[in-house]
Amino acid sequence: AREMLTGDLGVGRVIARPFIGTWPNYERTIRRHDFSLAPPRQTVLDALKAEGKDVIGVGKIYDIFEGQGVTETYPNQGNEKNMEKTIEIQKKEFDGLCYVNLVDGDMIYGHRRDIAGYAGALTQFDKQLGEFLANMRDDDMLMITADHGCDPGYTGTDHTREYVPCLIYGKEIKAGVNL
């Protein structure tokens, strides 16, 4: 099957998304699995690993990169548990990157157009973000971004066209500086 995914029309991954329930009351479970192809060239994860840095993946990071460049992984358990794991990792000594994927806003609420669920997930993340920020060391850097929009108030179930933010924070990062 992997040979079929390469060439001019190649894809990076095939996603298996299990559902529970029956129509129209079915829902996705967190037990998804990505069958990925290895990245075609070196990634930032590979470069960090080659320098002896920790590359810790939380959520589906290992799956997305087929494990390439990842030194430690914690599979997806949903946003709240993924943030709990991230805060646990943050409290340990490590030197490198902790790459976290919080997929609930997209997978569970965005595509299903569940505005109340989406708002609840953001509220929960906001609470945990406060704890994360309080634990940041002076030389830590936090980057928050997304790969696409998924407005739960829009029609249909596809991705939407919002601009994707890139928020960067660190106690030693100066405002207005080109990173």
What do these predicted regions represent?
Residues 1-179:
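Feature captures the catalytic ectodomains and active-site-proximal regions of enzymes
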